[in-house]
Amino acid sequence: MRREDKDVAFAGEAGGLSIDPAITPGRTIPLLSASYDVLLKDGVRIIAAKPKDIPAALRGQRGEIRSAVVIFDEGGEARVAGPVSLDSTGLLDGDITVTFKDGDKLGQALARAIPEAASVIKPALSAAALAAGKDKEASLILTIRKGKVSAGFIPIGNIPAL
């Protein structure tokens, strides 16, 4: 964590992450590595809040995912970046660019991690990977409005309020 004027940046990385299936019932998250760099606007004020008050303090705030990377050990990599904000009711808004490599393997890993979205994730990533070509990166924009996530006109799912 580092201070940037009134803002706060959070950054870190970890490899060989294993998610305990007991905390993700019905989901299998493959072994992965991850890194992140996230900026929270007016974060100094928010981190000074009592822990129980932080969720409420985040409402109405803006931030930026500068970079968040997940690399699955069995193949597939996703990077996300873009501005995000929470409205006064805790619903997320954002325009996130998702860039990925090895879309087929990434689609398989994400389908196991998010089985309720598998029917959308696997074909979308496979099609984008096919369009990009072998060993190339592909990108798509995820639009999030009031917690509703879509890729273009295709609805992906919902993110509950904080």
Task: Go through the PLM ranges and name each one.
Residues 1-162:
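Glycine-rich, small/hydroxylated-residue low-complexity segments
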